[in-house]
């Protein structure tokens, strides 16, 4: 009996050891990807903030009836949910889908959905949501190409009057251990209040500039949100893999103790039987 028990435990130890190697390797990869994602996000920050400031000044100088500021007559809202293509990243995808479901559930007839990431597609199908467009295979280091493709689709729907608002549901990267799901409205543009600042003058007219700048602005918005999402995904995956590796170590410690106890008990019993047999021969 002891021998059979030892064999089973040895198999479990081997299986968990192999799993630990995988989770440890994935954790190291996630750490490397997170470092790159943070660098990309930081590099984009200054340009993103400066561009937003310029757009805000242009919007403040433009006509309040401008399509991109005043909106259109549609009462439908488009939600773009940013999820991951691969799993093993803790509650990252679940949190985004839950946030999306919370804002759309009560008004499904007027809510349209675009999903980014394979996991989002799977989640929303289970919740019986239909999608207008699906974007997958987003690289770990997304570029303007991916942002432009999504922005073009959203702008096309907005300019045709098929939707009246565009919101992006994404995970904001705050730190390695802190990420927060946000719902960000990107259209129509809502200019920030500019207190005690003179309205800038533009040449050519602000309306013409706005028409040309709006597409780039939406692309930059989506690009920044994709960078936030990717950094958050990698941070969540790194944390999940670290936890999995720690759990594997705890299991291995417990199994090794159990293995040694059974082995010690078997040896003790064997010695007892030998001694008992020797005594019987006297």
Swiss-Prot record:
It is a peripheral membrane protein. Its main location: membrane. CDD domains: F1-ATPase_gamma (cd12151). It holds the Pfam family ATP-synt. It is found in: Cell membrane. GO terms for cellular component: plasma membrane; proton-transporting ATP synthase complex. InterPro entries: ATP_synth_F1_ATPase_gsu, ATP_synth_F1_gsu, ATP_synth_F1_gsu_CS. GO terms for molecular function: ATP binding; proton-transporting ATP synthase activity, rotational mechanism. Keywords: ATP synthesis, Cell membrane, CF(1), Hydrogen ion transport, Ion transport, Membrane, Transport. Belongs to the ATPase gamma chain family. F-type ATPases have 2 components, CF(1) - the catalytic core - and CF(0) - the membrane proton channel. CF(1) has five subunits: alpha(3), beta(3), gamma(1), delta(1), epsilon(1). CF(0) has three main subunits: a, b and c. Produces ATP from ADP in the presence of a proton gradient across the membrane. The gamma chain is believed to be important in regulating ATPase activity and the flow of protons through the CF(0) complex. This is ATP synthase gamma chain. It comes from Clostridium acetobutylicum (strain ATCC 824 / DSM 792 / JCM 1419 / IAM 19013 / LMG 5710 / NBRC 13948 / NRRL B-527 / VKM B-1787 / 2291 / W). The gene is atpG.
